[in-house]
From Swiss-Prot:
Residues 1176-1197, 1403-1439 are annotated as: Disordered. GO terms for molecular function: carbohydrate binding; endo-alpha-N-acetylgalactosaminidase activity; metal ion binding. Ca(2+) 1 binds at residues 288, 290, 292, 294, 299. It holds the Pfam family NPCBM. This is Putative endo-alpha-N-acetylgalactosaminidase. Residues 313-585 are annotated as: Catalytic. Coiled coil: none annotated. Keywords: Calcium, Cell wall, Glycosidase, Hydrolase, Metal-binding, Peptidoglycan-anchor, Secreted, Signal. Probably involved in the breakdown of mucin-type O-linked glycans. Specifically removes the T-antigen disaccharide (Gal-beta-1,3-GalNAc-alpha) from extracellular host glycoproteins. InterPro entries: A-galactase_NEW3, Endoa_GalNAc, Gal_mutarotas_3, Galactose-bd-like_sf, GH-type_carb-bd, GH101_dom-5, GH101_dom-6, Glyco_hyd_101_beta. Residues 1479-1509 form a propeptide. It comes from Renibacterium salmoninarum (strain ATCC 33209 / DSM 20767 / JCM 11484 / NBRC 15589 / NCIMB 2235). Ca(2+) 2 binds at residues 878, 880, 926, 929.
Length: 1509
């Protein structure tokens, strides 16, 4: 068929053109689709004499192309095939280029090649094949190109480094990629056979191994892809393989072969003139490397280690037994660098010197997520700056500790020195917490040299014991990732990252892999046996394994609120030490229930609970009990580190405790006895000596307690004197030494170990003190303080030759809410004095308390150089020299015990200031620093205390400060007092918008109810709420004329938003803290004009007892025209009943806003106001960007199916967003799906609800699946909820996009005119008739009513079904009025609007002489002018019976075979079609002619038979 042939030719031509286009357009990258089955050539003959060889290996190579044809092991003469087809082209810039090749054998081991593309003038490549040992290396040593013909990338797709075939026994190709879905292995092991499926295109992997039963081969390459190439992520395109037909095997079955080739090489990135490393690949050949009597992929994996490009710092991994995260955040400096050094020493003593990696999160600027794109040059001064940082590094090395830092090369914050309009893209927002970050232009960063300069600056400034760089939130792959890794590696850093998939070439530690709270089971650790076989000791990124285990991190230094040192230690002993013991050796054989390793190690079992680890045949671990040999030599880290691995001590641990007997390994079995030490906070504690009997020892252990055993007591690991406080001017500032040996303690003061295992000093119940002569201080001002859990306590500093300076406090209601502080949840706060040292010398420090039952605890004494702020009042603060924290303010309860969103902001004009990138306010108001709150959590943001700002009872004060506020009524200035441990708020004043620096001034009187305080509260919930403060001044105005109330008053709204024209509820809560009862209590509201209120419950009380409360519910009527934001105030007034008797009042106010006006045109959901605050599974819901992280505005662009959407909502399951549309919108439209950012991860179910009723529910939407476009009728809903539900076991990665979300509201929706219908002709009704009235387009579940008019007769009420249909079953009464009527139906239409519809109805008298035909007619159109005859004719066939027509005609439907189209009642003619179609409805029948009746009956039968034949 020529036509079909032409169509096929056209289709093929289209495919060819499409492929050509892809090749041309893909010049800057390699597409996976381009590796189709290559053209096959005849098998290559071995070129005589063209072979190269080492002492171990002979390789036959092609003279016509740099391909190995075969490998022969010299000692065994065993053989492995190389290429079986001749390559004749190289893919350059995505296009296959035919080439000419010449070759020359340079020496016995080397052949050189010159490769010249036929069609690229001026381009040539020098290449080489060289064999050394058991390894063949292919490399391109030179690329020559021209400006017109640049070589950007290249690939030899069918170089076929090794080929195995199903014709060879044991033919296998094992490959691996990094899979972080715990349920999905990253391994593919292909055992080639005649049934192996052929591959239409190549498959790719990060690692590949080929084997037969003779030899195995491992491969390495520097394959690299440009960033943005889909093959690049997780280095999954390093190796290509493809199952192809290989003729017919000896058994007559089809044979299948598979070859392994390198992936593509990148020479120049798109837009770059810089060239990358020249391409190379390697093949290493191996026999039975693990001596298990067979050759398989595991032998190739062992051999691969000899050519592997190992991760930088990989050799350090096995000695990083203890990983911990000292955390500094938001200017709090809770872990100064010298404090961390002491913690490192403390851990070393508790673990007898196990190797540590201390990862500093917050070493820059104001701490974590502050200017962390500044790798160097911006060290956290409040934590000690560069000097103390390097002291920490150098001091930690003697205790087996090395350090890492948390850097960010994805996002930058405006405060960073590196920040600029060129450095970032100001339109792309990133993480948003303390500040809004912006995504770095990484290509420019690389090409400008900025990235490497920042790396080099860190390397040059920090000491050599900084060995690791943890790269946060790094998503890039390919070239950008390679250049960052290379820069860090060249600078001597090992690489770690948040994700196990990031930077896989060098990633040695993944946070999500070690801390299982992150990521969910489908995005957490690397699940691949092959990669772990190779690199088990080089990385900590692995899935849990029942034999090998996996490393974990359990924190205690404030990261993610963790503060349990006991749990930290338990993780070391119960999990990490056995993992690291196995990592000391390399895996050699891995079976389902056993793993063999070098060093004589073997693991057997089925789970961690029953596994046994043996060394040299001796069990050293049984389940959760062990006696592990270890080296006592201090460990060192970094490039060139050499560690003594001699096993000369033993670690003993039993999870449950008890007595156990252990056979000793040969190193210890000959000893006569072993010294056993219990490990404590202070190091080794000698328990005694245990005899060695027949090479065994019997030990008794406490549960979860670690011990060390040595044959020689002189074998130690940790220095005897830890010298706590070195460099800090305070000896043992954290009370880590036993017995307060560096302090003068009196009155029973001692060290206490808290329930979390933290060490503090505790003063005795009698008069008690601790004191110390500090280190010598140079002249100047100093802040000297300590963390104190306060009851009456005095901190005194006496300078040498000077007068004592002290501060005394007796109580505090200020709970510690700082999540980064181990003391969170307690009432520890920092107590300090500012001291001027006139003459150099050593001051005396004393912390004392009088006798009392309440405990006083002390920790972290610190001396910091400071500058006093001059004041004209009792206190001034300009935040220019704050030593740590936000003094005089401390964090309040906003967000609870969490990381605050307030910090001391640093000027970096113009980026931190008003006007840049749409900023409406400045972060910094004066000089260099201001206190800045960024979109803070609701609650008390910060407050003073009686020791940061002492306010005396009975005096009046003025508090003033400079401020800017981006929005009105988002923050309030509050004051109150502490009643015991409970802060009581007594006054609140909303802060108006101020986009220029404005002076705030307010007076308050301090009462006798408790210590007075002032502070900032976040009351609003709007995004973009900024508040900056500077130049705080507190002045004493003298005695107060008023006595403040000892009471609190709060006011809350009972609804998210105020509904206009409706009654809204408010609740006022009054609580008295007066010492005695009060009288005449009255609570009143102060409302905006036009608003009215009535108390639904009592608002007055004649008396109220001490500590009593009054709750008043208010009904507030809001005018229909109210619109916008309002402030509702409340005031409580009462009289005291004991001295001082008088009137008291407490006030408060709350900000509310009214329902937005419903849209009147099509409106994007992201441009509309939410009702309340949406709930969301991760961070906040985002507008016009995807979900992002924990802060507003930190998501990437919305992207579904490769399409970027500028408008929409970014949510995360489980999520709920409410809108008010006021029945004015007909439909909601959106494109829904899981954002492309999550790739194949995440799943969720979307739904739309109107007024609480389900309108739409999606199927399960999964990452990587196609998005869906939805249009949902709203059926008149007033409120619309957009919900996303969790699908599956967890909601990890469920970034749920409502892209292009829009409400269709182009015009006000008019009520639908209902169209009721009857089940019978409308003029056929008679008294007593039964019929159905049906009406549709109603709102599902609504009630409709029917009436007969004009004399209304109720026909009933019916509820519409799910399809919006109501059916009324009606039977007319016998006395129903005759004549013309209307049936009127009223109800609610599908849009929720009141609707009406009518249908005419005629009720006639019953026919006194009805026809008797057996099949009465049902014609739907009996004519419009009926005759007057009294009866119709009879029909015995299929004819019809006229119901009152003139006797000159019959109207009918012709029985069951067709409907009459109606007839003219006067002429009897029928205007319809054929006889069969009209059913004789127009046939004239003269009266009295019976024959005709018979003919009609017969004809009806005939026609009926014809219709159904």
């Amino acid at each position: 068929m020529p036509f079909r042939g032409r169509r096929r030719q056209s289709a093929l031509r289209g495919l060819s053109l499409a492929a050509t286009f892809c090749l041309a357009a893909g010049s800057s990258g390699i597409s996976g689709a381009l590796f189709a089955t290559p053209a096959q050539a005849d098998p290559l003959p071995t070129a005589a004499g063209l072979s190269i060889n080492s002492a171990n290996l002979t390789v036959e190579v092609s003279a016509d192309f740099p391909q190995a044809l075969s490998y022969t092991e010299t000692s065994s003469a065993k053989h492995l095939s190389g290429a079986r087809t001749l390559a004749s082209s190289i893919t350059i810039n995505g296009t296959d280029q035919p080439v000419k090749v010449s070759s020359q054998k340079a020496d016995a081991q080397t052949v050189n090649y010159l490769i010249t593309p036929n069609n690229l003038a001026g381009v040539s490549l020098d290449a080489q094949l060289r064999v050394e040992g058991m390894t063949l290396t292919f490399k391109i040593s030179k690329i020559k190109d021209t400006a017109e013909n640049r070589v950007n990338n290249l690939q030899i797709k069918n170089q076929d480094l090794v080929t195995v075939s199903s014709q060879e026994p044991g033919a296998t190709v094992a490959s691996a990629v990094v899979s972080v879905d715990r349920a999905v292995s990253g391994d593919t092991i292909t055992n080639l056979s005649s049934t192996t499926a052929l591959d239409p295109t190549a498959k790719r992997s990060m690692l590949a191994i080929a084997a037969t039963d003779q030899l195995a081969a491992g491969f390495e390459t520097n394959s690299l892809y440009d960033s943005g190439n889909t093959i690049g992520p997780s280095d999954q395109g390093k190796f290509w393989r493809q199952a192809l037909a290989d003729g017919t095997g000896a058994d007559g079955k089809p044979a299948v072969k598979m070859a392994v080739s390198s992936g593509a090489w990148l020479y120049r990135s798109a837009g770059s003139d810089q060239t990358e490393e020249l391409p190379w690949s390697k093949v290493v050949i191996s026999g039975d490397a693990n001596a298990d009597g067979k050759v398989d992929w595991q032998d190739g994996a062992i051999a691969y280690r000899s050519i592997e490009s190992k991760p930088a710092g990989g050799d350090d991994v096995k000695n990083r037994v203890v990983t911990h995260i000292p955390f500094n955040f938001a200017s709090q400096a809770t872990h100064p660098f010298l404090r961390t050094l002491d913690d490192v020493k403390h851990i070393a003593l508790a673990t007898d010197g196990l190797g540590q990696m201390a990862l500093e999160k917050g070493y820059t600027s104001e701490g974590h997520d502050s200017a962390n794109s500044d790798f160097g040059g911006n060290f956290n001064e409040r934590a000690g700056g560069l000097t103390d940082f390097n002291a920490m590094l150098s001091g930690g090395s003697a205790y087996g500790a090395t350090f890492g830092v948390h850097i960010n090369n994805t996002e930058a914050y405006p405060e960073a020195n590196s920040f600029s309009n060129d450095f970032v893209d100001p339109t792309k927002k990133g993480w948003n917490w303390l500040d809004q970050s912006f995504y770095i232009d990484q290509q420019r960063d690389i090409l400008s040299g900025s990235q490497q300069q920042r790396i080099d600056q860190l390397r040059s400034e920090a000491g050599p014991n900084l060995t690791m760089a943890y790269v946060d939130v790094y998503y890039e792959s390919g070239w950008k990732s390679y250049r960052l890794q290379k820069g860090l590696k060249d600078a001597g850093f090992s690489v770690a990252s948040e994700f196990a998939t990031a930077m896989p070439a060098n990633n040695t530690w993944s946070h999500w892999a070690n801390d299982e709270k992150h990521g969910g089971s489908n995005n957490i650790k690397a699940g691949t046996q092959i990669l772990r076989f190779v690199d088990n000791s080089q990385r900590d990124i692995w899935n849990p394994d029942p034999l090998l285990g996996t490393s974990h991190i359990v924190e205690w230094e404030g990261w993610t609120n963790q503060n349990d040192y006991n749990a930290f230690l338990k993780n070391i002993w119960g999990n990490n030490l056995p993992v690291k013991f196995l990592q000391q050796q390399q895996i050699t054989s891995w079976k389902s229930r056993s793993v063999d390793l070098t060093g004589g190690l073997k693991v057997t079992g089925t789970s961690l609970a029953d596994r046994v680890i043996s060394q040299q045949g001796v069990p050293v671990l049984k389940g959760s009990n062990y006696l592990l040999p270890w080296s006592a030599a201090p460990v060192s880290f970094g490039s060139g580190a050499v560690n003594d691995t001699t096993q000369n001590k033993l670690y003993h641990y039993s999870a449950d405790g008890g007595t156990s007997t252990w056979q000793l390994t040969p190193q210890f079995a000959t000893a006569s006895s072993l010294q056993i030490y219990k490990l404590t906070d202070y190091g080794r504690e000698l328990i005694g000596s245990v005899p060695v009997v027949n090479g065994s020892v019997t030990l008794t252990a406490e549960a979860n307690q670690a011990y060390v055993l040595v044959a020689d007591a002189s074998v130690t690991t940790v220095p005897a004197d830890p010298s706590y406080g070195a460099g800090s001017k305070v000896k043992d500032p954290g009370f880590n030494s036993a017995g307060l040996k560096d302090w003068n303690a009196t009155g029973g003061a001692a060290v206490e170990r808290t329930a979390q295992g933290l060490l503090v000093a505790k003063l005795g119940q009698g008069s008690s003190a601790i004191s110390q002569t500090l280190g010598s201080l140079d002249p100047g001002s100093y802040s000297i303080g300590a963390w104190v859990e306060i009851e009456p306590t005095t901190l005194t500093v006496t300078p040498a030759g000077g007068a004592p300076i002290s501060v005394t406090v007796d109580q505090s209601g200020a709970e510690n809410f700082v999540a980064s502080d181990e003391k969170r949840g307690t009432y520890f706060q920092r107590l300090r004095v500012l001291v001027d040292i006139a003459n150099a010398g050593a001051p005396q420090l004393s912390i004392s308390a009088p006798a009392g039952e309440a405990a006083v605890r002390i920790d972290d004494v610190r001396v910091v150089k400071a500058n006093k702020v001059p004041t004209t009042g009792i206190l001034s603060e300009n935040f220019e020299n704050t030593d740590q924290g936000w003094l005089p303010f401390i964090k309040g309860d906003a967000g609870g015990q969490t990381d605050p969103r307030t910090h001391i902001a640093k000027l970096n004009a113009p980026y931190t200031q008003k006007g840049w990138n749409g900023k409406t306010t400045s972060d910094v108001l004066d000089d260099t620093y201001s206190l800045h709150s960024h979109e803070e959590n609701q609650g008390l943001v910060y407050r003073t205390s009686n020791y940061t700002l002492p306010l005396q009872a009975g005096r009046q004060y003025r508090v003033s400060f400079d401020y800017q506020a981006s929005l009105a009524n988002q923050y309030t200035w509050v004051s109150g007092y502490d009643s015991g441990k409970n802060p009581v708020q007594t006054a609140s004043t909303a802060i108006p918008v101020a986009t220029d620096t404005t002076r705030w001034s307010q007076t308050l009187s301090a009462g006798s109810c408790g210590p007075a305080w002032v502070g900032l509260q976040r009351t609003g919930s709007s995004g973009g709420a900024e508040f900056s403060m500077d130049n705080l001044l507190v002045e004493d105005l003298g005695p107060s004329a008023e006595t403040p109330a000892c009471a609190s008053l709060s006011l809350t709204s009972g609804q998210d938003v105020i509904e206009q024209g409706q009654t809204n509820t408010f609740s006022a809560s009054f609580s008295s803290s007066e010492a005695q009862s009060i009288a005449g209590l009255s609570v009143a509201l102060d409302l905006p004009a036009g608003w009215t209120a009535s108390a639904a419950t009592p608002a007055t009380a004649a008396t109220l007892p001490a500590g009593g409360s009054l709750e008043t519910q208010w009904k507030v009527q809001v005018p229909a025209d109210a619109d916008g934001d309002y402030t509702i105030k409340a005031k409580a007034s009462y009289q005291t009943t004991v001295d001082p008797i008088g009137s008291r009042s407490a006030t408060t106010e709350t900000a509310v806003y009214t329902l937005p006006k419903p849209p009147t045109k099509d409106t994007y959901a992201s441009d509309m106001q939410w009702i309340g605050t949406p709930s969301n599974g991760w961070g906040p819901v985002e507008k016009d960007q995807a979900n992002g992280e924990q802060a507003q505005g930190d998501g990437p662009p919305l992207k579904l199916g490769g399409v970027t959407y500028p408008k929409g909502l970014g949510a995360h399951a489980a999520s709920s967003i409410r809108y008010y549309v006021g029945s004015q919108c007909s439909a909601f439209t959106a494109v829904i799906g899981i954002d492309d950012f999550q790739k194949l991860k995440g799943q969720a179910v979307f739904s739309v609800l109107g007024d609480g009723n389900s309108l739409y529910t999606s199927p399960v939407m999964k990452g990587g699946a196609a998005a869906q476009t939805i249009t949902v009728p709203l059926n008149g809903a007033k409120y619309v909820d957009l919900k996303v539900a969790i699908s599956g076991a967890n909601n990890g990665n469920a970034w749920s996009d409502w892209a292009n979300a829009k409400f269709l509201c182009s015009a006000p929706v008019a009520p639908i005119t209902l169209q009721p219908t009857l089940s019978v002709p409308t003029d056929s009704l008679q008294p007593g008739s039964a019929f159905t009235v049906r009406v549709d387009q109603l709102k599902s579940g609504s009630t409709a009513k029917a009436e007969l008019h004009s004399d209304p007769i109720d026909l009933g009420s019916v509820q519409a079904n799910n399809d919006g249909v109501a059916s009324f079953q009606v039977t007319l009464a016998q006395d129903a009025p005759l004549g013309n009527h209307q049936i009127v139906v009223t109800g609610t239409d599908k849009n929720g609007l009141a609707a009406t519809g009518t249908v005419d109805a005629q009720i006639k008298a019953a026919n006194p002489n009805p026809g008797t035909g057996s099949n009465p007619g049902t014609g739907s159109n009996p004519g419009t002018d009926p005759g007057t005859g009294s009866a119709g004719g009879n029909s015995s066939g299929g004819g019809a019976n006229g119901s009152g027509a003139n006797g000159t005609y019959v109207n009918g439907s012709g029985g069951s075979f067709g409907n009459g189209a109606g007839m003219d009642a006067k002429t009897g003619s029928n205007s319809a079609s054929s006889l069969a179609e009209t059913g004789f409805s127009g046939l004239v029948l003269p009266l009295g002619i019976g024959l005709m009746l018979l003919l009609i009956g017969a004809a009806a039968i005939i026609v009926r038979r014809h219709r159904h034949s």
